């Protein structure tokens, strides 16, 4: 079962090993308390060039290291070193298809006190066959969740802390059990925060609006890339401000962004059609630019990409 989803090799306790050997004890501290920091990274296969491109590799590892330090984890690697390790795993696994990369930093100590000091941090990296996380071709139906996004003064959403994703799991499960594809969470002030694992944008009168980082959201790497594409390629004004729940229903278009979600249109929220209930024109254009950029098909955005194979 493991083989059908995960790839052959992983980075574990300082070396690349067969993925079956990358195992932790059930007594591992972070397993009990969620005191781990993770990232999600995609690599895209370009068939014409026969090249695998890692998207925003350095940026993801820089964020992981920054977030890890916030949990008092001092990892003995630079972002550049982690990128090289990731390339080596991909090459050793002979990956020639789209793949998801999951790095996770955790405390490996076999102790049961919920604290962040006097423990030993470790980092693991593995590969995963992922495919589409949500339906980017037809759009999805979303539900505004009864669960509120974590407040920055409890567990900051700007950090990818494993334990904080119970909040996401509650919201996502509620949405799925109610017949929807995804959840949209409000923050403690009642404004729109984000999806269970995605940032959110609305389009109104030709302008893109998205919650600012102060609205208890993850400062998404894909979010930043999408803002760049909207401004430079589509010449769409982008405003960062609080979004009221009711603005979701009156938006012309809504879409979600994230490493996993990529650019996912939302065509219905709480049984209300968004616009005409189909993917909007700005979202369609944005998707075209984004999917071409991540596969290395737009030269000016190859700076976002790290090639894996030497040519």
From Swiss-Prot:
List the PROSITE patterns.
AA_TRANSFER_CLASS_4
Which InterPro entries is this protein grouped with? Aminotrans_IV (IPR001544), Aminotrans_IV_CS (IPR018300), Aminotransferase-like (IPR036038), B_amino_transI (IPR005785), BCAT-like_C (IPR043132), BCAT-like_N (IPR043131), BCAT_family (IPR033939), Class-IV_PLP-Dep_Aminotrnsfr (IPR050571)
The protein's GO terms of the molecular function aspect are: L-isoleucine-2-oxoglutarate transaminase activity; L-leucine-2-oxoglutarate transaminase activity; L-valine-2-oxoglutarate transaminase activity
> So, what pathway does this thing act in?
Amino-acid biosynthesis; L-isoleucine biosynthesis; L-isoleucine from 2-oxobutanoate: step 4/4; Amino-acid biosynthesis; L-leucine biosynthesis; L-leucine from 3-methyl-2-oxobutanoate: step 4/4; Amino-acid biosynthesis; L-valine biosynthesis; L-valine from pyruvate: step 4/4
Listed A to Z, the keywords are: Amino-acid biosynthesis, Aminotransferase, Branched-chain amino acid biosynthesis, Pyridoxal phosphate, Transferase
Reactions catalysed, semicolon-separated, are:
L-leucine + 2-oxoglutarate = 4-methyl-2-oxopentanoate + L-glutamate; L-isoleucine + 2-oxoglutarate = (S)-3-methyl-2-oxopentanoate + L-glutamate; L-valine + 2-oxoglutarate = 3-methyl-2-oxobutanoate + L-glutamate
Cofactors, names only: pyridoxal 5'-phosphate
Which EC number(s) are documented for this chain?
A: 2.6.1.42
Residue numbers of N6-(pyridoxal phosphate)lysine PTMs: 160
Q: Name one GO biological process term.
A: isoleucine biosynthetic process
Q: What does this protein do?
A: Acts on leucine, isoleucine and valine.
Q: Which PANTHER family match?
A: AMINO-ACID AMINOTRANSFERASE (PTHR42743), BRANCHED-CHAIN-AMINO-ACID AMINOTRANSFERASE-RELATED (PTHR42743:SF4)
In the record, the note on similarity to other proteins reads:
Belongs to the class-IV pyridoxal-phosphate-dependent aminotransferase family.
Q: What is this protein called?
A: Probable branched-chain-amino-acid aminotransferase
